[in-house]
Amino acid sequence: MAFGLTVRAKRIEQGIGLNDFAERLGVSPAYWSRVEREQEKPPRDELVERAAAILGVRMDDLFVEAGRLPPDMRSDLRRVVQTYRRMRQILPK
């Protein structure tokens, strides 16, 4: 399932109206409706994190639905890549 559809299903399941949810996120209901209908790309990290908190779901799961790694995993991955590159320079071929 895609990000918007996942959030919409969870929001409806919990009985949270679109207007209330958008207000809690700090965005317009029109914008959030487009996100939920997959007419907008998944929102910036901060909104994904807030949506997860409001819905009580794992932030990592929503980031996966958004097609992105969570911010902490991005920095971990960056460090792994940097370490790998350093090791390739040091180790004999």
Which residues does each PLM region occupy?
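Short, basic-rich loop-to-helix N-cap that marks the start of a DNA-contacting helix
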Residues: G15-G17, E23, Q39-A53, L69
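Conserved hydrophobic/aromatic packing and binding residues within compact polymer-binding modules
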Residues: V7, F21-A22, W32-V35, L62
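Short, charged recognition helix plus adjacent turn
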Residues: F63-P92
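A short, Lys/Arg-rich alpha-helix, primarily the initiator
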Residues: M1-E13
